[in-house]
Amino acid sequence: MLSNISAGENSEVEKIVVKCSKSGMHNYIFITIPIIYSTIFVVGVFGNSLVVIVIYSYMKMKTMASVFLMNLALSDLCFVITLPLWAVYTAMHYHWPFGDLLCKIASTAITLNLYTTVFLLTCLSIDRYSAIVHPMKSRIRRTVMVARLTCVGIWLVAFLASLPSVIYRQIFIFPDTNQTVCALVYHSGHIYFMVGMSLVKNIVGFFIPFVIILTSYTLIGKTLKEVYRAQRARNDDIFKMIVAVVLLFFFCWIPHQVFTFLDVLIQMDVIQNCKMYDIVDTGMPITICIAYFNSCLNPFLYGFFGKKFRKHFLQLIKYIPPKMRTHASVNTKSSTVSQRLSDTKCASNKIALWIFDIEEHCK
């Protein structure tokens, strides 16, 4: 069994057995997955590069949300630039021609992106919750410095979680076929450590963040529903936006997390069936595509839905240089949020989109 010989997934070479050596080796995988990887690469580089340029050149990272979104775009960029390597790797029937160093770098970039993306999306949901539900109480804490320190902590924790890829990920050459794979190669004595890391990926990398994101946006929806109780159409818009955020996160990541857990069961010999091996090895690259398609959608959802971001984006494509003006800090804006939420003028300016607006003002 070639257990999860694909981008960013666990592979215990010592447990490869001859009777399952063809699991996951299907021609449609070698054709379809590289095409999808290439598509994600093009769209991801384009979308995330625009986010970086707009925030850095026009918005100057003056709010917590803009700092989080900038780091989210940079994290996604670090990942998507490795996709051509994985596309070639898959197209060559899981043969890695790029050497040991790129194997480690590309694999680490994937794990790093997984944790930074999830943690940053969680921080964005908490920031939106604080700004909308507790604008006055959160004013002191919601500063750019706090956001930057939070991002430093996120990158540090994500790197520590990626250390198994740095240490164990390497090329391995099968002597009978001369096939070179990029895999996690470790002794059988380390299996429980690797299983533990996979479970951490399930719990810390998905379940806990999902609960926080779901709770944050549920409370946001409840607050805005009370504010706009008399405006049914507005409530529907807000509700749809919040549901889109939660469902996008859930459906992009849950398939990959389920297959990661199945892989844990395989590593622990709980599952010892070649048919199930084939299902996991075949499905894993597909779930990877679904999960990391999120890297394409993030900038559009969290950036282009914002009114001010769209304005600066249009300036960029029209080659209009950024205006030399001081952007109002979120600290000077938050004191009037409570009044704005009840103001009819702000209601007419699509407050539903304010959930995603990283400059946080309604004019």
Swiss-Prot record:
<dbReference type="InterPro" id="IPR050119">
    <property type="entry name" value="CCR1-9-like"/>
</dbReference>
<feature type="lipid moiety-binding region" description="S-palmitoyl cysteine">
    <location>
        <position position="362"/>
    </location>
</feature>
<keyword id="KW-0807">Transducer</keyword>
<keyword id="KW-1133">Transmembrane helix</keyword>
<feature type="topological domain" description="Extracellular">
    <location>
        <begin position="1"/>
        <end position="27"/>
    </location>
</feature>
<dbReference type="GO" id="GO:0009897">
    <property type="term" value="C:external side of plasma membrane"/>
</dbReference>
<keyword id="KW-0597">Phosphoprotein</keyword>
<feature type="lipid moiety-binding region" description="S-palmitoyl cysteine">
    <location>
        <position position="346"/>
    </location>
</feature>
<dbReference type="GO" id="GO:0001595">
    <property type="term" value="F:angiotensin receptor activity"/>
</dbReference>
<keyword id="KW-1015">Disulfide bond</keyword>
<feature type="topological domain" description="Cytoplasmic">
    <location>
        <begin position="219"/>
        <end position="239"/>
    </location>
</feature>
<dbReference type="GO" id="GO:0006955">
    <property type="term" value="P:immune response"/>
</dbReference>
<comment type="similarity">
    <text>Belongs to the G-protein coupled receptor 1 family.</text>
</comment>
<feature type="glycosylation site" description="N-linked (GlcNAc...) asparagine">
    <location>
        <position position="178"/>
    </location>
</feature>
<feature type="topological domain" description="Cytoplasmic">
    <location>
        <begin position="305"/>
        <end position="363"/>
    </location>
</feature>
<feature type="glycosylation site" description="N-linked (GlcNAc...) asparagine">
    <location>
        <position position="4"/>
    </location>
</feature>
<feature type="binding site">
    <location>
        <position position="201"/>
    </location>
    <ligand>
        <name>angiotensin II</name>
    </ligand>
</feature>
<feature type="transmembrane region" description="Helical; Name=6">
    <location>
        <begin position="240"/>
        <end position="268"/>
    </location>
</feature>
<dbReference type="GO" id="GO:0019722">
    <property type="term" value="P:calcium-mediated signaling"/>
</dbReference>
<keyword id="KW-1003">Cell membrane</keyword>
<keyword id="KW-0472">Membrane</keyword>
<feature type="binding site">
    <location>
        <position position="186"/>
    </location>
    <ligand>
        <name>angiotensin II</name>
    </ligand>
</feature>
<feature type="topological domain" description="Extracellular">
    <location>
        <begin position="168"/>
        <end position="192"/>
    </location>
</feature>
<dbReference type="GO" id="GO:0016493">
    <property type="term" value="F:C-C chemokine receptor activity"/>
</dbReference>
<dbReference type="GO" id="GO:0019229">
    <property type="term" value="P:regulation of vasoconstriction"/>
</dbReference>
<dbReference type="GO" id="GO:0019957">
    <property type="term" value="F:C-C chemokine binding"/>
</dbReference>
<keyword id="KW-0325">Glycoprotein</keyword>
<dbReference type="GO" id="GO:0005886">
    <property type="term" value="C:plasma membrane"/>
</dbReference>
<keyword id="KW-0449">Lipoprotein</keyword>
<comment type="function">
    <text>Receptor for angiotensin II, a vasoconstricting peptide, which acts as a key regulator of blood pressure and sodium retention by the kidney. The activated receptor in turn couples to G-alpha proteins G(q) (GNAQ, GNA11, GNA14 or GNA15) and thus activates phospholipase C and increases the cytosolic Ca(2+) concentrations, which in turn triggers cellular responses such as stimulation of protein kinase C.</text>
</comment>
<dbReference type="GO" id="GO:0086097">
    <property type="term" value="P:phospholipase C-activating angiotensin-activated signaling pathway"/>
</dbReference>
<protein>
    <recommendedName>
        <fullName>Type-1 angiotensin II receptor B</fullName>
    </recommendedName>
</protein>
<feature type="topological domain" description="Cytoplasmic">
    <location>
        <begin position="58"/>
        <end position="63"/>
    </location>
</feature>
<feature type="transmembrane region" description="Helical; Name=5">
    <location>
        <begin position="193"/>
        <end position="218"/>
    </location>
</feature>
<feature type="transmembrane region" description="Helical; Name=2">
    <location>
        <begin position="64"/>
        <end position="91"/>
    </location>
</feature>
<keyword id="KW-0297">G-protein coupled receptor</keyword>
<feature type="transmembrane region" description="Helical; Name=1">
    <location>
        <begin position="28"/>
        <end position="57"/>
    </location>
</feature>
<feature type="binding site">
    <location>
        <position position="169"/>
    </location>
    <ligand>
        <name>angiotensin II</name>
    </ligand>
</feature>
<feature type="disulfide bond">
    <location>
        <begin position="103"/>
        <end position="182"/>
    </location>
</feature>
<keyword id="KW-0812">Transmembrane</keyword>
<keyword id="KW-0675">Receptor</keyword>
<feature type="topological domain" description="Cytoplasmic">
    <location>
        <begin position="128"/>
        <end position="143"/>
    </location>
</feature>
